[in-house]
Design a protein with these regions (language model features):
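Binding-site signature for planar aromatic cofactors or substrates
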Residues: 1-126
Length: 126
């Protein structure tokens, strides 16, 4: 599924992105900066996120590769005023080599992996 229109605008202007996975102990949420995602670039159907720690996220993805991202910004006009959100669901895995990892490491020397999200559903909110 493509990230386009208002959803793309929200993702490009968001300050932070929440990342939710689920493992044997239940749901787990971490976050990353929107600038990190935008520095890598946003292809139409996937999102690449630099990974510093996120060890529990990685363990959860090995058990269940489903993921949900949530972002928002007041820079995009919402239905009732300033502010629009976006929920992105899909599947993900950690890459420690290859093109996506190389792109992440070239910009973020501290990154130990690239979290690559294959987008399956995009919903705007607010």
């Amino acid at each position: 599924m493509k990230i386009e229109g208002t959803a793309r605008e929200v993702l490009e202007k968001t300050e932070w992105v929440a990342i939710a996975t689920c493992g044997s102990e239940g749901p787990h949420v971490v976050a990353t900066w929107g600038d990190y995602i935008n520095a890598i670039g946003i292809p139409d159907d996937r999102i690449v996120i630099p990974v510093g720690h996120m060890h529990k996220t990685e363990a959860n993805l090995k058990l269940d590769n489903r993921i949900e991202l949530l972002c928002g910004t007041r820079q995009v006009q919402g239905t009732y005023g300033p502010g629009k959100g976006c929920s992105i669901t899909g599947t993900a895995r950690m890459h420690t080599e290859g093109q996506d990892f190389d792109a992440v490491r070239s910009r973020f020397a501290w990154a130990r992996a690239a979290l690559v999200v294959s987008v399956e559903k995009v919903e705007t909110q607010l």
